[in-house]
C-alpha cells in the first residue's frame, strides 16, 4: 500500500523576545533540551546518531496559543513535561517512542487554566508531584498546584506586577522563591506554600528581577539576577540575604537575563552584554567567561541551561544555541536555524527562508540575515550561489543586492534555468535573470495576479478577477491565452509540469484544477480533498523506464493551510496518499528532493523530510 511516513524533522530554534528571558530545560536521562517555539513545544535530543530517544518531539496541544515555557519533570526516566502558554493554560504531557516505526506518540496527562495572562515560568518540585506556575494575571500572578489534579497547594503573593521566574528547592525542607517586574524577591515555605519573606532592597528599585534558581542537592543557596546587573545570593533554607556575587576584575556590563547551576558551587549567568560567565558562589569570583560580538544585537544572551560535566548551552537573541565547556576557551559548537514560519524553500542543496528575512543554508549550517522582511522565493540553480527575493523590495544573490523593485514583489517562481518570474503590487509581470537581477522581459497585467509559475517556455499567472489562469509564452510576453475554465475561488498556487503537458492550479478554498496545456481543457477537477488555501504544488520528478524512456508524469504532491500533505494521481484522480497534520498552522512549501523523498516546511518553522512508498 502506498504511504507517506515521516523520516526526519529539522526543528526550529527557541522563540526569543527582546528584553525577556527564554527559559530552557535539560533532562539528563534523555540528554535533551526542551523549549518553546511559536505554538509548539519542542524536545530536542543532543545525542548524535543511534539513540533510544527520538531526535525531536513536537507537542502541538496548546491549539492557537503561543507556548511560552516548557519544563522537564525531574523524576528520572519519567518523560513527563509541563508547558505553559500565553492564555494562562498549563499542560502536563509525556511521550513514547517506537524505534521500529520511528514514530512518537504524545499523551496529555492533565491540563489546567491557572492564570488570566501569559505564563512566564514553571517549576517542578523534586518529587515530580507539585508545580509552581507564574506569569501575568488579573487577580494573582502565580499558583502552586498538584500536577495531576490541579488542586491548590498554597498561594503566590507579595508581588504587584508580572512574575518572571520561580523555582522550587530540589530537596527537603521544601522552599520556593519567585521574582518579578516589581523588583521584589518573595520566599515561600511549604507545602502548603505560604509567604515567608519578601526582599525589595537588594535589587535596584524599578529594575526587573528576571531569574531565580536554588543550588542543586541540598539547596544551600538561592541566586537571583536582574536588569540592574546585580547577582544576589540568599540562604536556601531561611531566605535571608547573604551577599552580592561580584568580582572587581569582572564587572557585568549589561542586564542579566538568566542563570543555571553547574553544580552546588558554580553557576552560569548570561546577559545583554553578550557574555556568558561562570561564578563560584563561595569565593564570589568569576572563574570563566565567553564573550560574543557585542556590536551584534542578536548576540545578546537571553537563556542558559547547564547540561552536566561542566557543559553549558546558552541562547542568543537571534535563536542560536551556543555550546560551551568549562576549561575550553572557545565555543564547542553552535546550532542555528529558523524560529519564525518558513516561507521559501529549495532543495538539492537545501536552503530555506523565513518571514523575518533569515536564510539558512543547511549543507554548511550557515545562517544569513540577508533581508529585513518575508522571503518570497529562492533559486539555487547555480552552484555555490543562491538568489532570494523578499518583501523588502530587493533581489539579492548571496546577500548582495542585484535588483531593487519599484513596488513590492507579491509572489515569484524560479525555473531551473536561472530565471525568475515575479508579480508585483503594481500588477507587473517581470522575468528576471536570477543571478544578475537584470529584467529580461516585462508586461503589465490587466488585473491583479495572485499566483505565478515559470517553466522553460511558459509563464502561467493566476488572476484575481474572474479567477482565471492566463498563460504567456516566455519568448514573447505579448502572446498569451486564457485557460477556458476558471477556478472556483482566487488562485493561490500554480505549477506547470516539467514536460509542460499539464498545469495544476490551486485556489484559496483548497480545490485544485488540472489543465491539459495543449487542449486548454480541464483534465480533472476531482483533486478537492484539501479544506483550505493551497500553498504548494510539486510534480514528482520524471524517472527513466526500463528502456530509458521517460515515464509519463503522474504524481503531484500538494500542501495546504489545512496542515495536510496529499499526493494526487493524474491517471487515477480519486487515488490519494495522505500525511495529515504535517505542520502546525499549515504547510507553506513542499518539494520533491528525490523520487521517493518529499521535503516540507511550514508556519511552525520546522522542515520535515518524508519517505514516499508507492505501489
Curated annotation (Swiss-Prot):
Chloroplast in keyword set? no
InterPro entries in UniProt = WD40/YVTN_repeat-like_dom_sf, WD40_repeat_dom_sf, WD40_rpt
Keyword annotations for this protein? Acetylation, Actin-binding, Cytoplasm, Cytoskeleton, Repeat, WD repeat
Cell compartment(s), UniProt: Cytoplasm, Cytoskeleton; Cytoplasm, Cytoskeleton, Actin patch
Q: Which domain of life is it from?
A: Eukaryota
| PROSITE patterns xref list | WD_REPEATS_2, WD_REPEATS_REGION
- For the modification N-acetylserine, the affected residues are 2
Q: What else is known?
A: Present with 11100 molecules/cell in log phase SD medium.
What functional role does this protein have? Involved in the depolymerization of actin filaments. Enhances the filament disassembly activity of cofilin and restricts cofilin localization to cortical actin patches.
Q: Its family?
A: Belongs to the WD repeat AIP1 family.
Q: What is this protein called?
A: Actin-interacting protein 1
Which organism is the protein's source? Saccharomyces cerevisiae (strain ATCC 204508 / S288c) (Baker's yeast)
Its ancestry begins with:
Eukaryota, Fungi, Dikarya, Ascomycota, Saccharomycotina
Name the gene behind this protein.
AIP1
